[in-house]
Amino acid sequence: MRILKLTLLIAAMIMANLSQIAFADTKTEAFVKENADKVLALLDDDTIDASTRTEHFIGYMDEFTNIDRVAAFVIGKYSRRFSAEELATYRAAFRKYNLTAYELQFEEYRGSAIEITGSTDRSATDSIVDSVVRRQNGDSQDVRWRVLQRDGKYEVVDIALNFDGSLLWLAIEQRAQFLYLLDRTNGSADALINKLKELTDDLRED
């Protein structure tokens, strides 16, 4: 009888955990779907001008992502070595660069629709959401979203794109490039800030 009770208790605990995981997946998937739909709808809205679209886009991205968290991640140990002034200037430059890059990237998906295909919980507060972005011409792009939950709020901290079967996580790729530059320049915040400004200008000229 004791063994039976123990077995039932373990089974109940497993079922409870499974139901919590499924619930977390559903909420995280809905968060990605809802916000991606907002951005795609914004891109397709021909009733607003470019400056208004950019303003709305920035607002959506602030709801969708935590750019300051990503900014700290991509410079690793140097986030603790920069002075407060250097860190603030770097964050501003990183924010401007990332928002410009994301806006141009999303522009390529005008007329597209997103389909959520599943998700995986890495922990109770860390999930990967799988999706497919389908374009009007019939092409599709696999996109993965890493979503963290903090104090009941969801935020995207990285996006992965599938290029010819290889998965590229954008923040991880940025981290490798930024750390390479910082290591070569003895941790110069100015070198990284100037590089970000240069990259932003290049994006706007294209």
Language-model regions, residue ranges each:
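Bacterial N-terminal signal peptides that target proteins for export
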Residues: 1-8
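Early exported N-terminus immediately downstream of N-terminal targeting peptides
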Residues: 26-106
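Non-transmembrane domains of secretory- and envelope-associated proteins
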Residues: 166-206
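Surface-exposed, charged secondary-structure patches
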Residues: 99-141, 195-206
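Short beta-strand edge/turn micro-motifs at domain boundaries
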Residues: 140-176
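A mature extracytoplasmic/lumenal domain signature
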Residues: 94, 120, 132-135, 145-147, ...
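C-terminal segment of classical bacterial N-terminal signal peptides
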Residues: 13-21
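Intrinsically disordered, low-complexity linear regions
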Residues: 26-27, 45, 59, 66, ...
